[in-house]
A protein has these predicted regions:
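N-terminal alpha/beta PP-like core and its mobile active-site loop of ThDP/TPP-dependent enzymes
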Residues: 1-140
Length: 140
C-alpha cells in the first residue's frame, strides 16, 4: 500500500469520504489515487480558500474535513480558511504536495517555492495543532 492509499483509508476512518481542493503539479499522483479509489470523492473548487472553507464545514458536519492543494502558492492561499478552522477547533486535515527534499537541493528555485522548504511548514505550525513533512520515493 502506498502513502496515498494509506492517507485515503485513514481519512475514511475519521468519517471523511470527500476531499476538497484544486489539483496541482505536486498533488497529481495523489489525485489519481483519489480518482481510482472507491468510497472517496474529490470535490474540485475554483480557489484554494474555498476548498478550505468547504472542508471546514464538512468537518463540522461529518467529523473530519479534508483538503488538498499544491505546494506554496496553493498552501498560502488556504491559510485564512485553515486559521479559521483552527480557531473554531474544527477537525480539518490539510494535504499539501511538495517537491522532494532531494529535488529542492538540486533546484532550490523551483517554481512555487518561497524561501526554503520549511517556510510553509513553519507558517502552518502557527495555525494548526500539528504539522509533518513526509518525503519518500514511493509516497505519491
Amino acid at each position: 500500500m502506498n502513502l496515498g492509499i494509506f492517507l485515503i483509508e485513514q481519512l475514511k476512518l475519521y468519517g471523511s469520504d470527500h476531499i476538497f481542493g484544486i489539483p496541482g503539479d505536486y498533488m497529481l499522483n495523489f489525485m489519481h489515487e483519489v480518482e481510482e479509489h472507491k468510497g472517496i470523492e474529490y470535490v474540485g473548487v475554483s480557489r484554494e480558500d474555498c476548498a478550505g472553507y468547504a472542508a471546514d464545514a464538512y468537518g463540522r458536519l461529518r467529523g473530519c474535513g479534508a483538503v488538498c492543494v499544491t505546494y506554496s502558492v496553493g498552501a498560502m492561499n488556504i491559510m485564512n480558511s485553515v486559521a479559521g478552522a483552527y480557531a473554531e477547533r474544527s477537525p480539518l486535515v490539510v494535504l499539501v504536495g511538495k517537491p522532494s527534499s532531494d529535488d529542492l537541493l538540486v533546484n532550490p528555485n523551483r517554481h512555487h517555492t518561497i524561501n526554503d522548504e520549511n517556510t510553509q511548514k513553519d507558517i502552518f505550525k502557527n495555525i494548526t495543532c500539528n504539522t509533518c513533512s513526509l518525503d519518500s520515493e514511493d509516497m505519491f
